[in-house]
Design a protein with these regions (language model features):
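Charge-rich, low-complexity N-terminal segments
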Residues: 25-151
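Generic hydrophobic-segment detector
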Residues: 6-8, 52
Length: 151
């Protein structure tokens, strides 16, 4: 329905929706979850022991790995954020220190360091202290990687 409103002698028109629900501004409990992420990079060498001997990944080689850690939650009313990005960085730092410039095959749990196994390895170590963890993304090249959402 269109109604007229007079403001200082000027007629303004506005729409009034019949039978429309009132506008509700979400509170913290009513807002939808959001996902935020932080990206990290590290250099490491590895080889894949379970591929045929003539496969290129059977030989020692290195990557500039990219890791994207995503958490999910509701933005706080006071803070306006899901999580402080620096807090996310602090949570991942101990794992990053174990990976950067190391031979991944020598790390316990990464004897077969595929991107998939690396994502799961990170998840299992990060999730107990980061319950809002949503996804781990690993990129071992510009166009190859995996995403993991936990067990």
């Amino acid at each position: 329905m269109v109604r007229d409103l007079s403001l200082n002698g000027t007629i303004l028109q506005f729409l009034e929706w019949v039978d429309s629900p009132p506008l509700v501004i979400p509170t913290q409990n009513q807002s939808k979850p959001m996902q935020i992420f932080k990206e990290f990079s590290f250099e490491a060498a590895h080889r894949l022991p379970n591929v045929p001997p003539d496969h290129q990944c059977s030989r020692l080689h290195g990557h500039s790995f990219k890791v994207r850690i995503t958490v999910e939650g509701e933005a706080g009313i006071e803070s306006g954020w899901v999580m402080d990005f620096s807090e996310l960085g602090r949570a991942f730092r101990p794992l990053l220190d174990q990976l950067d410039h190391y031979y991944l095959n020598d790390i316990e749990g990464l004897e077969n360091p595929t991107s998939e196994n690396l994502a799961k390895w990170i998840w299992l170590r990060l999730q107990p202290n980061l319950p809002s963890l949503y996804e781990i993304e690993i990129r071992e090249t510009c166009n190859s990687g995996c995403r993991y959402h936990g067990d």
